[in-house]
Amino acid sequence: MHNIHRRHFLKAAGAVTAGLVTANIALNANASSVAPKPSSGKSVIGLIAPKMEVVRVGFIGVGERGFSHVEQFCHLEGVELKAICDTHQAVVDRAVEHIVKQKRPKPAVYTGNDLSYRELLNRDDIDIVIISTPWEWHAPMAIDTMESGKHAFVEVPLALTVEECWQIIDTAERTQKNCMMMENVNYGREELMVLNMVRQGLFGELLHGEAAYIHELRWQMKEINHKTGSWRTYWHTKRNGNLYPTHGLGPVSQYMNINRGDRFDYLTSMSSPALGRALYAKREFPADHERNQLKYINGDMSTSLIKTVKGRTIMVQHDTTTPRPYSRHNLIQGTNGVFAGFPNRIAVENDGFGTSYHKWDTDMQKWYDKYDHPLWQRIGKEAEINGGHGGMDFVMLWRMVYCLRNGEALDQDVYDGASWSVVNILSEQSLNNRSNSVNFPDFTRGAWEHAKPLGIVGA
């Protein structure tokens, strides 16, 4: 949803903050020694929905991110774009115009207020809903979607509180509907190749990973009335932690089989001073501008360390403020070698190419030739043509539709979305308690121990 009135944001953010205070107290106990929350339904690990000959799609939010999804779905076979919803008429008109230009039927439109999306959910000719709205709407919209009998596909993060995570999981288990957080980075060419390398044992036993979202986004502060910065800026005044952990953490979690043989155990976190946003506002806005009246509290650099039940470690960082090159780190270290991204480089003992592990090998072509993921081999060229973050967006949506049409389980489930997103909340709880460790809830309720690892799919 392209726009949200500031008063609605402040109300929602205030509720989140209040919830965190309560959660901080509740999670001081050792969660690892507490039995998981009982379920009112059946686990959705490996959930397979009945095959859909055609996937009928509704879109909630067609602004920045949502419009990109509309564009990509227009390139996919076996889908119908049935309805769209947004509070901002201009982006609704743009989406409708684009769909019609692609020679697809004109979708139904729902707009007018923040709850117009419920009219879309009342339709009986929609199978899945793509949710691309401000963060505070993700959980309630996902829950409403599943309650309406539809599968929910949600932009990142999945939720903003531990309780929201549990509510989403409980709803998915009770309704037996998919709720997938659309972590597109898991479908990048490099990430898929590294997953293939890991599954073939190239790095030996895994020990350590590093993940990040380092992306200078101060310029979004100039988006005042519409677009992402019109609402995301305020989160830097409400929270102090890792606001956006999933882009880097998703791939590393899949390398390590998190929730499929291992799981996150506990986390410790700290943040640097919060200086950059205020300095930017002072430089770029008039002294009496609202951006200069805000108190920015989110540390410019957030660093968290995660320990898994199997003893592995993961560093997760967040920085959208300081001037530096983009990075997600994407590092995975095993007993036989290491891969690191940004830029891509690898060092492996006995790598088969006669290269010494004492220095980085940056010639990636031979590695692509040997380990390129079958999924990218099949549709990589089409993905590069259609775009979307280098093609990863197209691959993700293509794979979602393929699974739904062919009766296969999705690659990411609701437990993944909750586990990766909850770093947002736990990092803040740790920071507020002098960086003492905070335990992860076991969102799978113990099922992680027997869940099948994500394989190397060929379609």
UniProtKB/Swiss-Prot annotation:
Cofactor note: Binds 1 NAD(+) per subunit. The NAD(+) cannot dissociate.
Gene Ontology molecular function: any one: nucleotide binding
Keyword Cell membrane assigned: no
Signal peptide: 1-31
Named cofactor requirement(s): NAD(+)
InterPro entries per UniProt: Gfo/Idh/MocA-like_OxRdtase_N, Gfo/Idh/MocA_oxidrdct_glycsds, Glyco_hydro_109_C, NAD(P)-bd_dom_sf, TAT_signal, TAT_signal_bac_arc
Reaction catalysed by this enzyme: Cleavage of non-reducing alpha-(1->3)-N-acetylgalactosamine residues from human blood group A and AB mucin glycoproteins, Forssman hapten and blood group A lacto series glycolipids
UniProt binding sites for substrate: 213, 232, 244-247, 326
Pfam families: GFO_IDH_MocA, Glyco_hydro_109_C, TAT_signal
Group of enzyme by EC: hydrolase
Keywords: Glycosidase, Hydrolase, NAD, Signal
Binding site for NAD(+): 64-65, 86, 135-138, 155-156, 184, 244
EC number: 3.2.1.49
Signal is among the record's keywords: yes
Post-translational modifications reported in the UniProt record: Predicted to be exported by the Tat system. The position of the signal peptide cleavage has not been experimentally proven.
Family label: Belongs to the Gfo/Idh/MocA family. Glycosyl hydrolase 109 subfamily.
Function: Glycosidase that has specific alpha-N-acetylgalactosaminidase activity.
Entry protein name: Alpha-N-acetylgalactosaminidase
